[in-house]
Regions:
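Flexible mid-to-C-terminal extensions adjoining Fe-S/redox cofactors in radical SAM and related proteins
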Residues: 104-107, 129-209
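Radical SAM enzyme [4Fe-4S]-AdoMet core and its adjacent flexible, acidic
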Residues: 1-113, 118-126, 130-135
Length: 209
């Protein structure tokens, strides 16, 4: 399938999510992407299945600390020298507890509700598949009307205060979909960031970067 997409001249990017079942394949996945000249991104955090109130399948999840180590290893494999230097400078800034950058207070840094949307199986339009409460049935208002209101809805979302002012905010993948709350910070992501920073520091000390 990938070969056919490339032959057709279509832009291609690999998005990977690592779980207990494929974490050991990370180096091979990255090697495949490099050998074929395909950009690759890693997602190490699995969102809880919010839409139907289902319990998360813990058999797929890795502990936040392991996600952090995987994230550091992935970045070490995929970043060039300049990117690694900038990342080291960023981590040093975080350790000095510099304040978060002003634009990092947004509750979602992705394109949800601004350049991307979801349509559910039952015809609801959502700005993000993990924010079902912000959606509405397409039959009631139509796409244009619902889409026009998504930007305002996303801007109204708020992160917990501890997240908005956290020095790690520039590194952390936290967003409104992760927290589902304007009060409680996601403790798992705090552990993820700590593990990531420790792993990057160890690799730098050992000359792995």
């Amino acid at each position: 399938g990938i070969a056919l997409l490339r032959e057709a001249g279509l832009p291609l990017c690999l998005n990977t999510t690592f779980t207990r079942h494929n974490a050991a394949d990370m180096e091979r996945i990255v090697s495949f992407a490099k050998e074929n000249g395909i950009p690759i991104r890693m997602t190490s955090y699995l969102f809880p299945p919010l839409r139907c109130g289902r319990e998360a399948n813990e058999s797929c999840f890795l502990p936040p600390e392991e996600f952090g180590r995987l994230g550091a290893a992935f970045d070490s494999l995929t970043m060039n020298a300049d990117q690694k230097k900038r990342r080291a400078e960023l981590l040093a800034q975080i350790r000095q507890k510099s304040p978060a950058l002003p634009d990092r207070g947004r509750a979602a840094s992705c394109m949800a509700g601004r350049g991307a949307f979801w349509v559910t199986w039952d015809g609801r339009l959502l700005p993000c598949g993990m924010l079902p409460k912000l959606g509405a049935p397409l039959k009631e208002a139509g796409f244009s009307a619902l889409w026009a209101g998504f930007g305002e809805k996303m801007d109204a979302q708020r992160l917990p205060g501890a997240c908005s002012g956290c020095p790690r905010r520039i590194l952390c993948p936290v967003c409104a979909a992760v927290t589902q709350s304007a009060d409680e910070p996601p403790e798992a992501l705090c552990r993820y960031c700590g593990s990531y920073m420790e792993a990057m520091a160890r690799m730098r000390e050992n000359g792995a970067d």
